[in-house]
């Protein structure tokens, strides 16, 4: 189920000029996910604030049962529970989130494991943790 979802997100991001990179973090990136795990995505975009304000992009991937916004410093997350049972956290960050030297929070998230889905600007190509 999540594989098709990730493919759909990648296609959307490839076609969307506002999206610079998409990565998976958390248990799916580490390969420790269980049937109850949510999918944690980080989306690098210079349009973070606009996407937080207008969350319609989340509707492109399925029918929504519930949606909430969560604030974590440089990352604003839109957590979505889809009617098909998937729970997805879209972490929206500005490109400065990946600026070197990485801040402590970014370093922790990435050190725990990440998987690049799309990297138009090659932010993750030579990233040293």
Task: Report the location of each language-model feature.
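Short linear sequence motifs
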Residues: 5, 21, 50, 54, ...
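Short secondary-structure boundary/capping segments within folded domains
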Residues: 13-15, 31-35, 79-80
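Short glycine- and Lys/Arg-enriched binding-loop motifs that mark or flank ligand-binding interfaces
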Residues: 22, 27, 81
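Catalytic metal-binding acidic patch
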Residues: 26, 30-58, 85-87, 91
């Amino acid at each position: 189920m999540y594989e098709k979802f990730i493919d759909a997100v990648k296609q959307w991001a490839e076609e969307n000029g506002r999206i610079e990179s998409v990565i998976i973090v958390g248990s799916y990136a580490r390969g420790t996910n269980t049937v109850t795990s949510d999918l944690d995505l980080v989306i690098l975009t210079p349009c973070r604030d606009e996407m937080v304000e207008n969350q319609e992009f989340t509707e492109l991937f399925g029918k929504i049962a519930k949606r909430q916004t969560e604030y974590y410093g440089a990352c604003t997350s839109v957590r979505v529970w889809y009617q098909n049972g998937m729970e997805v956290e879209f972490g929206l960050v500005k490109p400065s989130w990946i600026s070197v030297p990485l801040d402590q929070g970014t370093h922790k998230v990435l050190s725990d494991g990440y998987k690049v889905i799309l990297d138009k600007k090659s932010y993750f190509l030579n990233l040293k943790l």
